[in-house]
UniProtKB/Swiss-Prot annotation:
GO terms of biological process kind: positive regulation of gene expression
Segments of the chain annotated as binding DNA: 18-37
Family in the record: Belongs to the LysR transcriptional regulatory family.
InterPro entries, sorted: LysR_subst-bd, Tscrpt_reg_HTH_LysR, WH-like_DNA-bd_sf, WH_DNA-bd_sf
Function: Positively regulates the biosynthesis of andrimid, a broad-spectrum antibiotic, by activating the expression of the adm biosynthetic gene cluster. It specifically binds to a region within the adm promoter.
Record protein name field: HTH-type transcriptional regulator AdmX
Amino acid sequence: MKLRHLEIFYTVMTCGSLSRAAESLNISQPAASKSLKNAELKLGFKLFQRVRGKLLPSREALELFEKAQGIYQDLSNLRLLADNLARDPRAKFTLGCLPCLGLSLVPEIATDFYQQNSNLVMTLTAEHTETLVKKLDLREIDLALTMQPVQQGDIMATLIAEVPLVYVDKDYRQGAVEIDSIDQQRWISPGLDSLSTAIAAHRVFPATGLNVETCYMAMEFVKRGVGCCITDIFSARHSLTPEMIHQISPPMKIDLYLLRRADASLSPVTQKFVDFLCKRLRNELREINLELYPGNKKSIVSPV
């Protein structure tokens, strides 16, 4: 099947009639009919049967259409990639992050960077890691912040910070909590894979009566005194009052990774943001660590 035959076949399938397909392709109906007949001659079987003035796809056509849909999706992705390659990279960049970071850490840092760079065009998006990786592949975004060490294709993951985890509980008032002493009957599963994995390295909590898909939803229940949870310090500070946030003994952390394409250099403004981000994280996390765990002077941010 040649490309022009694929085009007329796919358009007839999606439009439902030869006349609408011809209109969509900006050709005459006789030309569309001739192209469809040529496709059937080339293939050696009928693609459509005319029944009461309507074109009904054959069994073979339905099977071909499944494959054709994938081809057209790839073409759509190719066009999107070409559009993204054509954009002016000099004073703009796009950052993706996890939803939990998009409600706490990222807006704070991005606001300060944006205000210091008046000629900047900055686009932010919040998605789960799998979607962020796809967007990096298509060059829809330049950078991504996630809590998973993705190693996939041309994607490079760099550890940029170790973020403290904290225990959140409206009713707890006894200082640092040992993870083994947390009441599993009150436990709210946070749902986030990377966070759950970090917690499971210290303790595996059995399934409970309350499970949520995001740490922010878990903290809404914590606010109401329904249960307790463990989350990152940035999300906790965004959602809860200080008396609901408690240290964990021994200290726990979750890794923060910067994702980018390994086969493409960063534009000057994107590199400037990366430097700004790492410096800001270094300073903030040093203060947070000393506040949570006095005497722990370890540097917890590594250079990119």
